[in-house]
Amino acid sequence: MNIHFIVVGQKMPGWVQTGYAEYAKRLPKACTLKLVELPMATRGKSGSVAQYKAEEAKRILSAVPKGAKLIVLDEKGQELTTVQFSQKLDDWLGSGQDVALIVGGPDGLDSSLIQQAEWKWGLSKLTLPHPLVRVMVAEQIYRAWSVLQNHPYHRE
């Protein structure tokens, strides 16, 4: 299974690339994490937030592989424990489908995209910076994988 981690925004600091790469490389071929960076909509004086989000939603949907489960990160999404998330990962692995895990731009995701999602994942009630989210998601996927494999990385 491939997890296509589709994010709006580019040019992350070096520490983000290093942290993300560290956790992504720890995952086995049976559960690969592939980063897909998309440019933000160009902000201008005449545009609106709704227009920017709609433009980004089109880019996101064009990057989602055919047949992939659509999962969005959303501040109002379901928050899970590590063990609960590992069960979610196990379900994804068992389905045989790829997963498209979506992070929107600075203005969030278009509501039409959120409505299309099979699941809405909330990392925290806190507002988190996009660079940190990239590393956290990669780490949580690796942690969930380690729980499924009874690897000592995660401790209860």
From Swiss-Prot:
GO terms for molecular function: rRNA (pseudouridine-N3-)-methyltransferase activity. It holds the Pfam family SPOUT_MTase. GO terms for cellular component: cytoplasm. It is found in: Cytoplasm. It catalyses: pseudouridine(1915) in 23S rRNA + S-adenosyl-L-methionine = N(3)-methylpseudouridine(1915) in 23S rRNA + S-adenosyl-L-homocysteine + H(+). Its EC number is 2.1.1.177. InterPro entries: Alpha/beta_knot_MTases (IPR029028), RlmH-like (IPR003742), tRNA_m1G_MTases_N (IPR029026). S-adenosyl-L-methionine binds at L73, G104, L123, S124, K125, L126, T127, L128. PANTHER family: METHYLTRANSFERASE, RIBOSOMAL RNA LARGE SUBUNIT METHYLTRANSFERASE H. HAMAP family: 23SrRNA_methyltr_H. Belongs to the RNA methyltransferase RlmH family. Specifically methylates the pseudouridine at position 1915 (m3Psi1915) in 23S rRNA. This is Ribosomal RNA large subunit methyltransferase H.
